Structure formats: structure tokens, C-alpha cells
């Protein structure tokens, strides 16, 4: 598969597709990293060796109504330096932690949720309601979490009328940066 297509469709610019599978209404792309790690990120030693691998599946953006599974061979690396204990798997730039979906898929789900319910979105994409809810909760937590109060030295408080009558709102602002705290 063309690596330019992998990059533009799913953001896989450091990976290559080794083969494709078609099972029912699902496209499975088998990918692996283009280049292997050569230098230990912990000690800088140049003898980093492969130490096994694991296969992980990620839900990718659908194509033409077909579900896309990105099946990645995640390589583990171990440092040969006796003083170093580095033994980790390679980084996965298109997904976070143990998530089973890509960043672009999560962005797509959030876009659909602007006009659809959780149930409708899960039915359309053929994924569980729990996965859609997890994506939505992560999005809300990231964008609407309370701001950090670290480094705030002085605040300003303003109360204003939202509508004429007895509806008042209070706003708390960091006076140095102008960021709204509450």
C-alpha cells in the first residue's frame, strides 16, 4: 500500500503496510515501523536489540462504510549495556496508551457526536457504546477540565448580570495572564 495514503488517511508516516486483509465488512491493515530504534534512549548506547513483539489492533477511520482495523506489530527493544535496564516497546505515535483506537478515529467520533447520540454513533461505526462513551469522556476531560491554579499569584473577581433581573454570574480571572479560572 502507498505510504502517502497511509499518512494522509490515518497519520501513519513512520510505518509501512506489510499486507492487507478483507474479511466481510472489515479491512485489516498489517503495519510495522519503517525503521528500528538504534540508540538506547536511556543511556545512549548503540547496541539496542529486538526483544520480542506484540500484535495490537487499533480501530482506524472507516473507508467507504467499511470498518478499518490497523494491526500493528509492536516491537520490544532491550539495551545490551550491562549498566542499563532499558527494556520497552516502541512508541505508538497515532494512539494513546492502551487505547484501542487511533487519534484520528477519536476526532471523527467527536465530530459525529456533535449531531448524533452515543447509540447512533456506535451503531453507525459498528463499535461498542462503551468505546464511544470513553472517547467522548476523554474529549470532555481534555477540553473542559478545571484550569490549573499553579502559578496564579493574584486574581480578579467580577460579578455581572446575565439578564436583566436577578440572574448574576461571577467570573474569576488570573490578573497576570488574563486566563479565566472560573
Regions found by a protein language model. Give the residues of each.
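Short, conserved DNA-binding cores of transcription-related domains
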Residues: 1-86, 90-92
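Secondary-structure boundary/capping micro-motif
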Residues: 19, 78, 112, 176-177
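Mobile genetic element proteins and their domesticated derivatives, centered on retroelements
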Residues: 29, 40-43, 79, 109, ...
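Residue-level detection of the helix-turn-helix DNA-binding "recognition helix"
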Residues: 45, 126, 137, 141
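Short, Lys/Arg-enriched anionic-surface-contact patches
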Residues: 85-105
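Short, amphipathic alpha-helical "recognition" segments used to contact nucleic acids or chromatin
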Residues: 101-116
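Short, basic interhelical loop/turn and adjoining N-cap
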Residues: 113, 119-134
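RNase H-like nuclease fold core
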Residues: 133-182
Amino acid at each position: 500500500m502507498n505510504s502517502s495514503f497511509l499518512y494522509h488517511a490515518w497519520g501513519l508516516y513512520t510505518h509501512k503496510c506489510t499486507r492487507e486483509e478483507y474479511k466481510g465488512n472489515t479491512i485489516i491493515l498489517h503495519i510495522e515501523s519503517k525503521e528500528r530504534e538504534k540508540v538506547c534512549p536511556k543511556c545512549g548506547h548503540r547496541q539496542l536489540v529486538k526483544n520480542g513483539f506484540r500484535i495490537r489492533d487499533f480501530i482506524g477511520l472507516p473507508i467507504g462504510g467499511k470498518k478499518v482495523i490497523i494491526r500493528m506489530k509492536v516491537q520490544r527493544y532491550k539495551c545490551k549495556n550491562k549498566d542499563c535496564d532499558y527494556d520497552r516497546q516502541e512508541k505508538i505515535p497515532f494512539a494513546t496508551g492502551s487505547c484501542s483506537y487511533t487519534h484520528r478515529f477519536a476526532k471523527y467520533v467527536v465530530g459525529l457526536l456533535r449531531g448524533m447520540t452515543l447509540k447512533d454513533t456506535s451503531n453507525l461505526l459498528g463499535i461498542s457504546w462503551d468505546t464511544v462513551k470513553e472517547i467522548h469522556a476523554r474529549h470532555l476531560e481534555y477540553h473542559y477540565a478545571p484550569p490549573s491554579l499553579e502559578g496564579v499569584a493574584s486574581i480578579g473577581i467580577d460579578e455581572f448580570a446575565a439578564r436583566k433581573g436577578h440572574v448574576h454570574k461571577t467570573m474569576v480571572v488570573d490578573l497576570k495572564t488574563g486566563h479565566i479560572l472560573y
